[in-house]
Amino acid sequence: MENKMRYSKKTTAKYTAWCFLATVLYAGILMAAEAPWGNATVIETEYKPQKVVYDVSVNSIEKMTSVLDRASYLSKITGADPFDSSIILVLHGGEIDFFAIKNTQKYRDLMQRAQSLVQSEVLKIRMCQIAAQGHGYEAEDIQGFVKMVPMGDAEIIRLQNEENHAYMR
């Protein structure tokens, strides 16, 4: 004889409900383990034009490209008004070699981008003369869209104190 167990509809409904609840709770636990503090929220913010000096000392094309990207985006997000905003990059590190005229072919894409940003008044580029000389360059060896300043650190301080530029690294 075959032993068949029969459950009431009420018992089956309770079992199904418990299984569903257990599945939902388990899924919630898994999600909480992946994001135990929830997800970030976006704060919609409108930015006014800014005065900013970037202290640039990088040694790779990727890092220099990132600096140009950030400065360009800052200009865009703050209104890109050359009369109310000012973004100045002060170069005094390994990136100096990218701006040497003798390296134009090697870094053509980067230089075209930098020159375009200067030409369109998105930003200005200044280079430390002392650092350039340390790399073996004089002003005549550097691309014409770059302005040479006697000392990068002194220029950064001057821009902060005299022209109220915020400091960015």
Give names to the regions the model predicted.
Residues 6-20:
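Bacterial N-terminal signal peptides that target proteins for export
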Residues 18-28:
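Bacterial N-terminal signal peptides
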Residues 28-34:
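Bacterial Sec-dependent signal peptides at the C-terminal "C-region" and cleavage site
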Residues 34-86:
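N-terminal secretory signal peptides
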Residues 52-55, 88-91, 124-127:
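Structural recognition of the beta-strand scaffold that forms the well-ordered cores
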Residues 59, 92-95, 130:
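Solvent-exposed coil/turn segments that connect beta secondary-structure elements
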Residues 85-99:
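Acidic helix-start/capping segments at beta-turn-to-alpha-helix junctions
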Residues 100-169:
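A cross-taxonomic marker for long C-terminal extensions/tails that follow the last structured domain
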